[in-house]
Amino acid sequence: MAKKVLTQIKLQIPAGKATPAPPVGPALGQHGVNIMQFCKEFNERTAKDAGLIIPVVITVYSDRSFTFITKTPPASVLLKKAAGIESGSPKPNKQKVATLKRDVIRKIAEQKMPDLTAATLEAAMRTIEGTAKSMGIVVED
């Protein structure tokens, strides 16, 4: 018989740095999940992505066991890393903070493809370009 799903918890945690401190501890503790076990498994699974923020969906079952799925980092985090900037522009229409080539956008779109609803790579690239534009990053050919 399948386990009964109690809840799903969505968090964004820095790769390899999950600790029982907030936001992880309280979110998992209120559902009776073994926090240290989650932190250990998450840190092992995301050690190679150090420095990135990793979205995670934790499914908690009625017997207090859990499973989790890690997703690709948010597009904004990948764009900031590629452009070498700390944050996007406060006025993206007037003040541009960086310039990226289209091939960099293509690489980010390929990486994000499993988590995007886009049917083609070109559609995924347009999605990433829209995110870049809203952050004040110029995309060149």
UniProtKB/Swiss-Prot annotation:
The keyword Membrane does not apply. One or more lysine residues are methylated. One of its GO terms (molecular function) is large ribosomal subunit rRNA binding. InterPro entries: Ribosomal_uL11, Ribosomal_uL11_bac-typ, Ribosomal_uL11_C, Ribosomal_uL11_C_sf, Ribosomal_uL11_CS, Ribosomal_uL11_N, Ribosomal_uL11_N_sf. Part of the ribosomal stalk of the 50S ribosomal subunit. Interacts with L10 and the large rRNA to form the base of the stalk. L10 forms an elongated spine to which L12 dimers bind in a sequential fashion forming a multimeric L10(L12)X complex. PANTHER family: 60S RIBOSOMAL PROTEIN L12 (PTHR11661), LARGE RIBOSOMAL SUBUNIT PROTEIN UL11M (PTHR11661:SF1). This is Large ribosomal subunit protein uL11. The lineage of its organism: Bacteria, Bacillati, Bacillota, Bacillota incertae sedis, Caldicellulosiruptorales.
